[in-house]
Amino acid sequence: TVSQGVAYTVNKIREHLVAGEGPKLRLLPEQITLEDILSQLPKQHILPRGGGDMILGLEESRLGPLLFNTRTDSHLYLFGDAKTGKTSFLRSIISEITRLYTPREAKIMAIDMRRSLLGAVPEEYTLRYVTNHQDAMKQMREVAQFMRTRLPGSDVTPEQIRNRNWWSGPELWVLVDDYDLVATSSGNPLMDLLDLLPQAGDIGLHVIITRRMGGASRATYEKVLQMMNDLAVTGILLSGNPREGAVINGVKPKRSIPGRAQVVHRELGV
């Protein structure tokens, strides 16, 4: 048979190799835990406080940790089909926030219409946990009003801006699961943050959005997601139908196993 012939040929080639077999190709594991990736990090990355390198996953090209620097980058957005890892991604983000920050250094506001993150945010880190649209509109308006008090005024010196020490308090992480259930015809709570997104690094604001893949290419014209794209925010594409078309920076989704993703970075590409 063909398979027997191929096996015979491979064995003959192996017998005549002078230098022995070459190194085996390393592939991404089917499953990996956050603890597995943490074990690969240098010691100085393990327990920093006040932000730093957040683990997003394992990078395929070098099979090393894929990191997100919270001191230089503020936001993330992710698209994926059902049961491909959207909520698990947010749970990992929550775990990383609690690793990188103390409760005095960071607070989390979660907008979670399906209650998928119920119990995931430690109480000492929770600023708000919102599960309905009306509360989300009200709470986000209040949060945005407070964050505007951190915007640098004319009296703030260039040195203060470099050191970001004209305000004090925790950084705010706004985590939004199922964004398609949040941004509706009844309004979008995140519109209150729209003008703050470009200045987020100055005021300690982080916004992380997950959304289903269906209709993603159309959704990117929605104002908040469009701002994310304009700011060249790192985007993540989990498994999805390629027919959806270009979603992030011209990149189309593709079918893959749960947890496997394309990461679109402004400098590194895909």
Regions found by a protein language model. Name each.
Residues 44-233, 240:
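P-loop NTPase catalytic phosphate-binding loop
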